UniProtKB/Swiss-Prot annotation:
Organism from which the protein derives: Staphylococcus epidermidis (strain ATCC 12228 / FDA PCI 1200)
GO cellular component terms attached to this protein's record: cytoplasm
Protein's name according to its UniProt entry: Ornithine carbamoyltransferase
Keyword Cytoplasm assigned: yes
UniProt xrefs under PANTHER family: ORNITHINE CARBAMOYLTRANSFERASE, ORNITHINE CARBAMOYLTRANSFERASE, MITOCHONDRIAL
Location of the protein in the cell: Cytoplasm
Main localisation: cytoplasm
InterPro entries hit by this protein: Asp/Orn_carbamoyltranf_P-bd (IPR006132), Asp/Orn_carbamoylTrfase (IPR006130), Asp/Orn_carbamoylTrfase_sf (IPR036901), Asp_carbamoyltransf_Asp/Orn-bd (IPR006131), Orn/put_carbamltrans (IPR002292), OTCase_ArgI (IPR024904)
Amino acid sequence: MKNLRNRSFLTLLDFSRQEVEFLLTLSEDLKRAKYIGTEKPMLKNKNIALLFEKDSTRTRCAFEVAAHDQGAHVTYLGPTGSQMGKKETAKDTARVLGGMYDGIEYRGFSQRTVETLAQYSGVPVWNGLTDEDHPTQVLADFLTAKEVLKKEYADINFTYVGDGRNNVANALMQGAAIMGMNFHLVCPKELNPTEELLNRCERIATENGGNILITDDIDKGVKDSDVIYTDVWVSMGEPDEVWQERLKLLKPYQVNQALLEKTGNPNVIFEHCLPSFHNAETKIGQQIYEKYGISEMEVTDDVFESKASVVFQEAENRMHTIKAVMVATLGEF
């Protein structure tokens, strides 16, 4: 699979089914090698820049540990750590970093920014999250589902419940279409994905033997699901009126025990990209409770802590799948 060498990883839509399967298989191989102590560093003497406009726990740790395991050196540039967007354009930053580093990870706001970095840096660029997409997350989600369910990807009934327009929902729909999955997106009509993205994903799903269903009918949408997935309903910094409207729309779509039972599948698993507002024990969770009287948002605490929940295995797999992306695009095989 040498054709992934020097490729950027900006969106799953840039990759074929065979290429995504290769990345997932490589993730399994690298994970196994790490566990049994036979991992071989394939990124020796590589220098990697982590460019973060948004803070993160999982994405930063996954990239740093993966790079260290593989022998690479990392420079972390946080939200105040570079001049990009303030005194320097993304195009100029790309050319500066591209002259010093062998690869660049970007986590921030605009998909256009990560595309600009890839266009002008001359080195592989990896999308750690934008407002529109989150491709590295989906690799971890799919790997976890396969590990736990013991099913091939095309045999998994994958259901996302919640805000159908957000970056994780977008990325999951893309990935499911590419892998030929049966994918359900259960959300209020007001929060459906864009027609443009939906039409493109439906075409890809048809080509790969998959299926996509968009519905606001919870009973219909979750029936026979193997995976129930959700994400946060709102983002920090959005105005109060947006919060109120979003909470009103999404409250019926909370992932709780009753919703899991509607799947009719006693072995259904629960996934979440994290962090999650499943209780009021965080600063923001407490603020939400005080302002809106809600102690559990997108998922209830009992589901989050249940045997169905695989969120921490999923979080670990961020590291293994991100390692696979870096090795495949930058490594010396």
